[in-house]
A protein has these predicted regions:
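Divalent metal-binding pocket/active-site signature
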Residues: 1-30, 40-53, 67-79, 93-97, ...
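Compositionally biased amphipathic helical and low-complexity segments enriched in hydrophobic
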Residues: 2-3, 56, 105, 114
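Hydrophobic faces of well-ordered beta-strands that scaffold small-molecule active sites
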Residues: 12-15, 34-36, 58-62
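Active-site micro-motifs of SAM-dependent methyltransferase domains
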Residues: 34, 66, 109
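Conserved short-loop catalytic and cofactor-binding motifs
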Residues: 34-37, 72, 87
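Mid-to-C-terminal alpha-helical segments outside catalytic/metal-binding sites
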Residues: 78-114
Length: 114
């Protein structure tokens, strides 16, 4: 649909992707970005998708909280992002600091942050 409408697919961000495996592969192969949060990593399918997201297409979700009636302070968001980075790092067999630096670079690229 996005290609049909003329949108640049490489600027699409899938927020907490929960589609089928085939849809995931199509979106990944098209160069879409994927944002990940702790709740996504709580499921087997979510962890598998996170493992397969290319590092240059990975973002972390910052629209906390993922659950209603949970703490929404800046500190709780920072802790959640750190846990998410560590979990993704373990899935990808790399250091959490690498995940954090890649995500920061991706955010700068996607959102044209200077």
């Amino acid at each position: 649909l996005l290609k049909f409408r003329g949108f640049p697919v490489s600027s699409v961000i899938f927020h907490w992707f929960s589609g089928t495996s085939n849809e995931f592969v199509r979106a990944r192969n098209a160069g879409c970005y994927f944002s990940v949060n702790e709740r996504m990593l709580a499921t087997k399918r979510g962890r598998e998708y996170a493992r397969q997201i290319p590092l240059d297409r990975l973002l972390l979700e910052t629209d906390a909280p993922a659950e209603p009636n949970t703490e929404t302070s800046v500190q709780s968001l920072i802790r959640s992002l750190a846990r998410t980075s560590m979990h993704i790092a373990s899935l990808k067999n790399c250091d959490a600091k690498r995940i954090e630096s890649v995500v920061l670079a991706n955010a700068h690229s996607v959102f044209d942050l200077r």
